[in-house]
Design a protein with these regions (language model features):
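Active-site-adjacent segment of FAD-dependent monooxygenases/related oxidoreductases
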Residues: 70-74, 78-145, 159-162
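Conserved mid-domain beta->alpha element of the FAD-binding
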Residues: 37-52, 138, 293-374
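C-terminal helical "tail/cap" subdomain of flavin- and related membrane-associated enzymes
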Residues: 8, 17-30, 325, 340-421
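Glycine-rich, N-terminal phosphate-binding loop of Rossmann-like dinucleotide-binding domains
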Residues: 67, 188-189, 320
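Conserved FAD-binding catalytic core of PHBH/FMO-like flavoproteins
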Residues: 140, 147, 151-157, 161-297, ...
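Conserved hydrophobic helix-helix packing surfaces used for dimerization/oligomerization
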Residues: 34-36, 57
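Glycine-rich FAD pyrophosphate-binding loop
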Residues: 51-72
């Protein structure tokens, strides 16, 4: 392993943000076993898991630590994700402060119907805990372990991953640096450099863009329900979610040509009420928004997920619409497969894990893509839906809540399929 400096804090005090010491590597390349591109939750989780396994790693992130922590994302964790956080030594706060959920509610035709996730899935549940908090916990764990994260690394470029000696170059404080490594893990998201570094002829991309978005609002108000409410209405989809007992996250389906700034808080709350059942509408507590944004919805998969000594993980390889709460969980399962493969490589000198990484990931990815597409198609109003389509959706929802077989299928997928399926 390479010697590493103790963690330093930048002027902001964000954990793991290095403000000095980088210039010393300007002429002599750094060396690590695994170079991780991206310090979001998937990159940080992989870094912690590798560290626990005695595998050296350095993370490069093009944004600042503050920017990474400022991203508002999903907040529903499957048990597999919780187990990986535990293995990484970063689950203490998620266990203490996360909200275990044993069910969800489906709202259609003005009435709510509960799906017993726990009872239908053989005792599994999900945990509501914001991605921002997951990221914060992993950043703090990495800093406490003295591991190297280089934030604001510009012009990151990947080299030689189709051979035996890959490397990564980047610019920091105006100087170009080289990081030599055994493997590169691309955890830098849909717009990151990792997937774009692969020749177009070597990758096949599948994509579906949905004709609507989600207008989301974050507010420090108690949730309207202790479990999530998914609403199908003639006005469009709505979701009542939460981050804690005092912070709520709400969404309404909107058109792609709308802008968040055109929606006042009052207009949002009024529209949400119109999409809820009378009891929920009456109990809804409103307040000023902490954050308001519109997110487009898409399904996307890039195949394969391994290119020589480069591995893609998380949003770098696949995107799901947020309806099924699968994005962060898929990223975590990718990381789990890669962690296992690299432990096998370094511990047993076996290529079996890395050779089957892409196949294992994609088998799980496509099942989650199918579920997310199905749930999105069922709950949203499409331009072509019309009165007939609305009736079909309502009939399917009615079947779903009355049929134990159908409810079980929903529950199994929502809480997360087994890792070996």
């Amino acid at each position: 392993m390479i010697a590493q400096s103790p963690p330093k804090q930048g002027a902001s005090g964000a954990p793991g943000v290095y403000a000095c010491g980088i210039h010393m590597f300007a002429e002599t390349p750094m060396r690590t076993q695994v170079a991780i591109i991206g310090a979001g939750p998937s990159g940080l989780l992989l870094g912690q898991l590798l560290h626990k396994a005695g595998i050296d790693n350095i993370i490069l992130e093009r944004q600042s630590g503050e920017y990474v922590l400022g991203r508002i994302r999903a907040g529903v964790l499957e048990q597999i994700s919780m187990d990986l956080l535990k293995a990484a030594g970063a689950d203490q706060r998620a266990v203490a402060e996360g909200l275990p959920h044993d069910g969800i509610e489906l709202l259609f035709k003005g009435q709510r119907h509960r799906i017993d996730l726990h009872g239908l899935s053989g005792g599994k549940r999900v945990t509501v805990y914001g991605q921002t908090e997951v990221t914060r916990d992993l950043m703090e764990a990495r800093a406490a372990a003295g591991l190297t994260t280089i934030y604001e690394a510009k012009d990151v470029a990947l080299h030689g991953f189709d051979g035996a000696s890959p490397s990564v170059t980047y610019v920091k404080d105006g100087q170009t640096h080289t990081l030599q490594c055994d493997f590169i893990a691309g955890c830098d998201g849909y717009h990151g450099v990792s997937r774009k570094s692969v020749p177009e002829s070597a990758v096949t991309e599948y994509e579906k863009v949905y004709p609507f978005g989600w207008l989301g609002i974050l507010a420090d108000v108690p949730p309207v329900s202790h479990e999530l409410i998914y609403a199908n209405t003639e006005r469009g989809f709505a979701l009542c979610s939460q981050r804690s007992a005092t912070r709520s996250r709400y969404y309404v389906q909107c058109s792609l040509d709308e802008k968040a700034e055109d929606w006042s808080d009052e207009a949002f709350w009024n529209e949400l009420r119109l999409r809820l059942d009378p009891e929920a509408a009456e109990n809804l507590i409103t307040g000023p928004s902490l954050e308001k944004s519109i997110a487009p919805l898409r399904s996307f998969v890039a195949e394969p997920m391994r290119f020589g000594r480069l591995f893609l993980a998380g949003d770098a390889a696949h995107i799901v619409p947020p309806t099924g709460a699968k994005g962060l969980n898929l990223a975590a399962s990718d990381v789990g497969y890669l962690w296992s493969a690299l432990r096998e490589y370094y511990g047993e000198r076996s290529n079996a894990g890395i050779d089957h990484y892409s196949e294992k990931c994609l088998r799980r990815v496509w099942k989650a893509e199918r579920f997310s597409w199905w749930f999105t198609s069922l709950m949203h109003k499409f331009p072509e839906t019309g009165a007939f389509g609305q009736k079909i959706q309502e009939a399917e929802l009615d079947y779903l809540v009355r049929s134990q077989a159908a409810s079980t299928s929903l529950a199994e997928n929502y809480v997360g399929l087994p890792a070996d399926w």
